[in-house]
Regions:
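Mg2+-dependent prenyl diphosphate-binding active-site environment of isoprenoid biosynthetic enzymes
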Residues: 15-173
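Single conserved hydrophobic/aromatic residue that forms the stacking wall/gate
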Residues: 1-18
Length: 173
């Protein structure tokens, strides 16, 4: 998928191949968690994902919730892994950014807005804000994490964040 290629492209720019693998793996975990939870009856209630039964249909709701939660925590475990060559202060920045991207200012916040906007007339700017949270923040993380690892300057990190968020928004269109 284009998301996987983008994740690998940006992560390959870091100085450590092992760290890029862990970053890519954590993003895949986050993405899978978000899809599993998005399909649940209390969310979008989708029965199919990519033409196959959604996780809650195939394995039950409780297993789907626990699987999604486990993938979410696994993403953080992967980045916190001590056996790769990234300085602790950079790991902390990456973990903080990942938490932001999946929490109330990111995926979870975007999903909340999505659910609250159902069957309502909502302005275009609110829809854009929701989409930037739901996908833009994770793409932002994909672009920013390698910049953090490589020790990029503040302007470069800000630019990478902006580019990632915009790519994520375009992904929604």
């Amino acid at each position: 998928s284009s998301r996987k290629r983008h994740t690998r492209f940006t992560s390959d720019r870091s100085s450590d191949v092992c760290s890029s693998d862990l970053i890519c793996g954590s993003v895949e975990c986050i993405h899978s968690y978000s899809l599993i939870h998005d399909d649940l009856p209390c969310m979008d209630n989708d029965r199919l994902r990519r033409g196959k039964p959604a996780t809650h249909i195939k394995f039950g709701e409780s297993t789907a919730i626990l699987s999604g939660n486990s993938l979410l925590t696994l993403a953080f475990e992967m980045i916190a892994e001590k056996n790769y060559n990234v300085k602790p202060n950079k790991k902390i920045l990456i973990l903080k950014k990942l938490a932001e991207c999946v929490g109330h200012v990111g995926i979870a916040g975007g999903q909340f807005l999505d659910l609250s906007y159902e069957k309502k007339k909502v302005s275009g700017s609110k829809i854009i804000s929701m989409q930037k949270k739901k996908t833009g923040k994770l793409f932002e993380f994909c672009c920013l994490a390698p910049a953090i690892i490589s020790g990029a300057d503040t302007k470069t990190k800000k630019d990478m964040s902006f580019v990632g968020e915009e790519i994520g928004f375009l992904f929604q269109i």
